[in-house]
């Protein structure tokens, strides 16, 4: 079964964004919508939770 890729509803219609999906083991995969057959970044559930927590906490603010 193929898993569906999702992108932000705020990204508009252009293929110029990050797409994400959650797979069966709970991990999260990301890809570039401009290159759907290109490389995929994969994160374990704990890695993804740490990233989201850091983003919400301002850890990556410039």
Residue ranges and their predicted role:
Residues 1-62:
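Positively charged, low-complexity terminal tracts
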């Amino acid at each position: 079964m193929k898993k569906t890729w999702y992108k932000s509803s705020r990204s508009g219609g252009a293929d110029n964004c990050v797409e994400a999906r959650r797979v069966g083991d709970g991990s999260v995969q990301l890809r570039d919508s401009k290159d759907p057959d290109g490389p995929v970044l994969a994160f374990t559930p704990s890695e993804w939770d740490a990233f989201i927590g850091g983003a919400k906490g301002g850890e990556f603010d410039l």
